[in-house]
């Protein structure tokens, strides 16, 4: 490409481009909106058609399987479209509200009960841009043009002065995937993937994908370039028997790269740029040498964050899901991916399920454990709590037989007792205190 400069009357220089033929070799950088299938196809070396393939079997809620990264998800709805609307391509379906009444839930929180007209529905795009964090930790945001913005815990939305109760939420993919687009594919990228050029994206951007054809992208490029706000893992905890259906979960606590504590503002900045998590499975290989399989995940169904002041990303796995085929207990390397940050890598071991019987009783301060053998209970510990309440007992060592705990239990009250083994996943039981 040749360039010439022309002197304008005001004394400024005007850049003239001569010989446009070479522009076809130009690469454009910016952000694209990719479905989960489009994103993970390049990462996993699979065709997007395979990732999108579904079957005619309905799940327990009556929804049809529409592929490994099915947009229909009760977990998606449960974790809140408010948090998803910043980084993800979200659609919300609602029924027209005829009347509503304010009530309280079991925890005393205010909620609305609606009378709706199911024959009048509205599907809208939910999209918001993060603006600031208030002194009280409240996330301040604005609606993106042509979309609705949902408040935290929103149960409805407004369109043209009409209110609609939210009945379903679909998360189709990620809105801001950094991509490199060849000049000849730029038009298709804009039309199919909502590509927008952005000067913040360069050839050195961490996570950069290259558009290869009109419907495929390369694996992401991993950059070693440091950033002053990079994060690392602080601690990783594990849990089992999630109420959201996970077989196992990792709680990844974050801190600054220099080892200092992460502020709430810094954590919110991170999650507002958070995209996804990659799971690499090593089976029983504690050295993380022999990779058995890699899995793509879907935010809200497999990973999530909360608006509280704990800098934590939760990562769950359900061994029976199509996208986790061949997975099971063992060693995993989790890679947390966020725009503008180097990858955060967390190693975790998910323990096998305890298949034996265990009997639990509560009376006064005494917890009685029976059924399991003494060896299984070696180095075991318990947590005890009532629904919606802080833990009464946390991480107290127990053994077979009677154990005197550090709290009194109210007779007739139901408690959750979680027994955590050394070599098995934890066991939970609902127990009414005597």
Curated annotation (Swiss-Prot):
The protein's Enzyme Commission number: 3.4.-.-
Lipidation (N-palmitoyl cysteine): 20
Record flagged with keyword Protease: yes
Organism classification: Bacteria, Pseudomonadati, Spirochaetota, Spirochaetia, Spirochaetales
Cellular component terms (Gene Ontology): plasma membrane
Entry GO MF terms: peptidase activity
Additional facts recorded: A recombinant non-lipidated form (residues 20-434) is recognized by human antisera, indicating the lipidation site is not essential for antigenicity, although the acylated lipopeptide clearly is antigenic. The non-lipidated form also binds penicillin.
Name of the top EC class for this enzyme: hydrolase
Location(s) in or outside the cell: Cell inner membrane
Assembly mode: Probably a monomer; a non-lipidated construct (residues 22-434) is monomeric in solution but crystallizes as a homodimer.
Any single biological process term in GO: proteolysis
Main location: membrane
Protein's UniProt name: Putative DD-carboxypeptidase TP_0574
Cofactor binding summary note: Carboxypeptidase activity is stimulated by zinc. Penicillin-binding is stimulated by zinc.
Swiss-Prot/TrEMBL keywords: Cell inner membrane, Cell membrane, Hydrolase, Lipoprotein, Membrane, Palmitate, Protease, Signal
Any Pfam family: PBP-Tp47_c
Gene3D superfamilies: Penicillin-binding protein Tp47, domain A (3.30.1490.200), Penicillin-binding protein Tp47, domain B (2.30.30.470), Penicillin-binding protein Tp47, domain C (2.60.40.1300), Penicillin-binding protein Tp47, domain D (2.60.40.1270)
Function: A possible D,D-carboxypeptidase, that releases amino acids sequentially from a proteins C-terminus. Has zinc-dependent carboxypeptidase activity on synthetic depsipeptide substrates. May serve to decrease cross-linking of peptidoglycan, promoting the highly sinusous motility of this spirochaete. Overexpression of the whole protein in E.coli leads to aberrant cell morphology and extrusion of the cytoplasm, while overexpression of a construct with the first 62 resides of the protein fused to PhoA does have this effect, suggesting the whole protein, not the lipoprotein moiety, is toxic.
């Amino acid at each position: 490409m040749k360039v010439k400069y022309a002197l304008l009357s005001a004394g400024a220089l005007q850049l003239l481009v001569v010989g446009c033929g070479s522009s076809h070799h130009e690469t454009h950088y910016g952000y694209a909106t990719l479905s989960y299938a489009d994103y993970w196809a390049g990462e996993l070396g699979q065709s997007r058609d395979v990732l999108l393939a579904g079957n005619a079997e309905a799940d327990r809620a009556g929804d049809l399987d529409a592929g490994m990264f099915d947009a229909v998800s009760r977990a998606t709805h449960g974790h809140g479209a408010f948090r998803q609307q910043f980084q993800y391509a979200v659609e919300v379906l609602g029924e027209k509200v005829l009347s509503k009444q304010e009530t309280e839930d079991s925890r005393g929180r205010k909620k609305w009960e609606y009378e709706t007209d199911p024959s009048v529905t509205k599907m809208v795009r939910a999209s918001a841009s993060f603006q600031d964090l208030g002194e009280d930790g409240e996330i301040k945001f604005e609606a993106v043009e042509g979309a609705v913005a949902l408040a935290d815990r929103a149960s409805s939305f407004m369109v043209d002065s009409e209110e609609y109760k939210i009945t379903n939420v679909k998360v189709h993919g990620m809105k801001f995937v950094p991509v490199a687009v060849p000049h000849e594919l730029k038009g298709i990228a804009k039309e199919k993937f909502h590509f927008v050029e952005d000067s913040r994206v360069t050839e050195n951007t961490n996570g950069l994908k290259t558009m290869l054809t009109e419907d495929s992208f390369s694996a992401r490029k991993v950059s070693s370039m440091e950033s002053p706000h990079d994060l690392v893992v602080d601690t990783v905890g594990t849990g089992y028997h999630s109420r959201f259906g996970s077989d196992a979960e990792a709680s990844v606590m974050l801190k600054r790269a220099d080892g200092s504590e992460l502020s709430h503002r810094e954590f919110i900045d991170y999650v507002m740029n958070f995209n996804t998590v990659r799971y690499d499975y090593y089976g029983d290989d504690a050295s993380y040498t022999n990779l058995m399989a890699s899995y793509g995940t879907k935010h809200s169904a497999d990973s999530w964050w909360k608006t509280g002041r704990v800098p934590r990303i939760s990562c769950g796995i359900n061994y029976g899901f199509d996208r986790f085929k061949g997975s099971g207990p063992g060693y995993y390397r989790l890679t947390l991916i966020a725009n503008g940050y180097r990858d955060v890598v967390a190693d975790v071991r998910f323990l096998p399920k305890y298949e034996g019987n265990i009997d639990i009783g509560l009376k006064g301060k005494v917890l009685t454990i029976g059924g399991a053998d003494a060896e299984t209970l070696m180095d075991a510990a318990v947590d005890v709590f009532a629904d919606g309440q802080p833990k009464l007992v946390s991480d107290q060592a127990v053994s077979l037989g009677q154990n005197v705990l550090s709290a009194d239990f109210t007779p007739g009250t139901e408690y959750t007792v979680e027994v955590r083994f050394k070599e098995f996943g934890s066991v939970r039981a609902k127990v009414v205190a005597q």
